[in-house]
Design a protein with these regions (language model features):
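N-terminal Sec-pathway targeting helices
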Residues: 4-25
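Catalytic glycan-binding domains that act on GlcNAc-containing polysaccharides
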Residues: 52-231
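Iron-associated oxidoreductase/ferritin-like identity signal
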Residues: 14, 35-38, 231
Length: 231
């Protein structure tokens, strides 16, 4: 009989062990998974999703950058499930990379804008985790409809309460402002006050407060210095 190379054998045994662990975890939660077929309530669907996410996390190592984002999200929102926090963290990482922004900067904007609350509404009407004005949200949804398959006709102000949608729109918007003003400070001020207001002040040499930009940059430095936890 042909002797299998030792490294190949070890790899095969390792895969078999991982598969056995995966099957074992699924077996433990089989009753909950089967219950999905008898009820479609949001709570039970969320529980099933979190179970499957937990299994995936156990089997798949997470990059340090994602783990660091997750730790920031959970430190501000200990009330949400790990599965939900991972999903939010993944979107922050993906969108930041796509728009060439530091995810720690995106987290800093979220911290100052909403404190990571999904349904916050400002006195001016800005909504969601990145505090987007409804008219801006509608415009961004139309702009990105081809890229993400958004349906602008179904957009409502309440749509911005979806944190994943809000993050996608907010990161794209911040990216556009950095290109327009060619300055992170000015882009942050425009994110807060509106690009028209900042442009008008620049053209007419009108002073403006940089307090908002300072708050965001302070949060950014704090997040930047923090180390990702080890799980």
């Amino acid at each position: 009989m042909e002797k299998r190379p030792q490294k190949t054998l070890a790899r095969t045994l390792g895969c078999s062990t991982a598969c056995c662990q995966f099957v074992f975890v699924l077996a433990l939660f089989a009753p909950a998974i089967l219950a999905f077929h008898h009820s479609t309530s949001d709570t039970e669907v969320s529980k099933i999703t979190d179970i499957l996410t937990a299994v995936e996390v156990a089997e798949t190592p997470r990059p340090d950058g994602l783990v660091k984002i997750f730790s920031v999200v959970k430190s501000h929102r200990p009330d949400i499930s790990d599965g939900e926090a991972w999903r939010v963290s993944e979107v922050i990482l993906e969108e930041s990379a796509k728009r060439h922004l530091d995810p720690m900067m995106v987290l800093a904007v979220i911290r100052v804008e909403s404190g990571f609350q999904y349904t916050t509404v400002s006195p001016m009407g800005a909504r969601g985790i990145m505090q987007i004005m409804p008219e801006t949200g509608r415009f961004l949804t139309e702009t990105l409809s081809g890229e993400y398959g958004f349906h602008p006709a179904s957009f409502r102000p309440e749509s911005l309460d979806d944190p994943l949608l809000n993050i996608r729109l907010g990161v794209y918007y911040l990216h556009g402002l950095t290109k327009q003003f060619r300055s992170l400070n000015l882009a942050l001020l425009a994110y807060n006050a509106g690009p028209g207001e900042i442009q008008n002040r620049l053209e007419n040499n009108i002073a403006f407060s940089e307090e908002y930009a300072t708050l965001v940059l302070d949060a950014y430095q704090s997040f930047k210095k923090s180390k990702p936890p080890t799980f």
